């Protein structure tokens, strides 16, 4: 029993970021959970995010739900129980930001309590998270991050950029700016022998 507690303790402290349900679903649909883990480290979710992404998704027959479940089983994503502190903070968020779902409030409160950056796409949720001091990360920057960190090739980064742009209906100007940044990094690496 003590060994299991020690393993759980190590796992909890190895999380590098948390992720909300909608961002996780987008990444699962794009088959890009591995890229997110490469960029941000092991991802933490709450039980309510698991409920929304895995159990509800499997009930509806969504393939992305199975991808998320496999990422949980493999340890890329860790499901965390929420304690009373998180429940109270989530309730406060829900009262002040009525547009947020319970799942959003839980993951924001979890991130705040654990001092983890939060991968989060929804604008309202980002504003609520940032208002309580949570660092937020947009998945729009994922293609740049994985290329800068050299965890993905230029070609894979371009594919991820294209997929994210389509999934999030990014304006072409934003997509072109990100593509230009990838091109410039590639050029600089070539100039520096890398």
Model-identified regions with their sequence ranges:
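Positions that flank functional sites
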Residues: 87, 126, 144
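A short alpha->loop->secondary-structure connector
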Residues: 127, 131-137
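Short, ordered loop/turn segments at secondary-structure junctions
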Residues: 123-124, 141
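Helix-rich interaction surfaces within compact, conserved domain-sized segments
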Residues: 163-166
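Long, amphipathic alpha-helical surface segments
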Residues: 168-170
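Active-site-proximal, substrate-binding regions of enzyme catalytic domains
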Residues: 2-110, 114-116, 123, 134, ...
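Long, charge-dense
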Residues: 139-153
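Short Asp/Glu-rich motifs
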Residues: 55, 130, 148-149
């Amino acid at each position: 029993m003590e060994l299991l507690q020690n393993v759980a303790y190590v796992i909890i402290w190895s999380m590098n970021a948390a992720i909300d349900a909608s961002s996780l679903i987008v990444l699962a649909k794009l088959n890009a959970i591995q890229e997110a883990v490469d960029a941000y480290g092991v991802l933490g979710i709450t039980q309510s995010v698991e409920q929304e992404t895995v159990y509800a998704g499997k009930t509806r027959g969504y393939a992305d739900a199975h991808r998320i479940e496999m990422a949980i089983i493999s340890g890329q994503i860790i499901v965390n129980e929420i304690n009373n502190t998180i429940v109270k903070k989530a309730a406060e968020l829900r009262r002040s930001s009525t547009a947020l779902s319970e799942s959003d409030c839980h993951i924001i409160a979890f991130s705040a309590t654990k001092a983890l950056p939060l991968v989060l796409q929804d604008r309202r949720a980002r504003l609520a998270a940032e208002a309580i001091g949570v660092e937020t990360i947009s998945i729009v920057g994922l293609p740049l991050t994985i290329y800068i960190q050299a965890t993905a090739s230029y070609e894979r980064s371009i594919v991820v950029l294209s997929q994210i742009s389509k999934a999030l209906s990014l304006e072409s100007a934003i997509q072109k700016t990100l593509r230009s940044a990838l091109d410039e990094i590639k050029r600089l690496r070539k100039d520096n022998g890398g």
